[in-house]
Amino acid sequence: MSLYENKKVVAIGGGHGLGRMLAALKVFGSNATGIVTTTDNGGSTGRIRHCQGGIAWGDTRNCINQLITEPSISSMMFEYRFKGAGELNGHNLGNLMLTALDNLSVRPLDAINLIRNMLKVDVNILPMSEHPSDLAALAMDGKWVTGETSVDEMTQDLRRLDLAPEVPATKEAVTAIQDADCVILGPGSFLTSVMPPLLLPELGKAIARNQTAKVIFVENLSPEYGPAGRMSLEQKLEWCERACQGRKIDVVLGHHPHPELEQRWNFVTRDLASANRDWRHDRQKLRQAIEEQLMN
């Protein structure tokens, strides 16, 4: 039995980072699962949430886009973005399709699975929660800031991060973590992509209780801006471990060494950058690095 058939891998995050990771893990097929952040309130996603309510679909759509292997009319439609004047300008048709299917389905996960089947995507895609929630940050001056876009623009550092309102985790996401041989955090925007799923107590507890899984934190290749950009790697790792009830991160996978932190964490340094875009992870290099950890 091959590694791809024998090991179950869960990646947690959002945005382009999670999509990139899932594309690297595509060889695992249905043994790979992405748990996607659903708190975005900007762009096409934010406009849809403002009008229709519901969870944010943009990160889920992005992940599915990066997993499409067979170009088709359906995939072209799913990736289409409207241009020009009027209310449709800037909207992504995939976001609208997911919203429509959500309205027609019993639960948001049904909408995702319908799209996955239509586009022949084997990797499991799970929303962190099927209930709408926003990111909320407590600034150093004691004021709360609500919404991903507002958190990204904060000039003050953060005391804490929360979800408003508190929502339950998707039960399939909890099960996927319980059954995983490897749980991957990142890459991606730390505060707005990696942290939101970890703010759900059920997901943090599931990671803490799965003592046989290898928990891997994947560093970004380029610096972040806003409050996340002012956080040290040490702070980010501590935030993740705190959200996971003190569960130790087993491996920090990155492009550069961090000798000052090697007493506390196990660092694995690899060339992970794409040859033509050094700010973006190379799918093949990511896959090889994760496989290496699964075999150790």
UniProtKB/Swiss-Prot annotation:
Q: Where in the cell is it found?
A: Cytoplasm
Keyword Cytoplasm in record? yes
Predominant place of localization: cytoplasm
Q: What's one Pfam family here?
A: CofD
User: Which cellular component terms (GO) are annotated to the entry?
Assistant: cytoplasm
Tell me which UniProt keywords the record has, alphabetically: Cytoplasm
* PANTHER family (alphabetical): GLUCONEOGENESIS FACTOR-RELATED, UNCHARACTERIZED PROTEIN YVCK-RELATED
**Recorded family membership:** Belongs to the gluconeogenesis factor family.
Tell me the function of this protein.
Required for morphogenesis under gluconeogenic growth conditions.
> NCBIfam families of this UniProt entry?
CofD_related
Q: What is this protein called?
A: Putative gluconeogenesis factor
Q: What is the lineage of its organism?
A: Bacteria, Pseudomonadati, Pseudomonadota, Gammaproteobacteria, Vibrionales
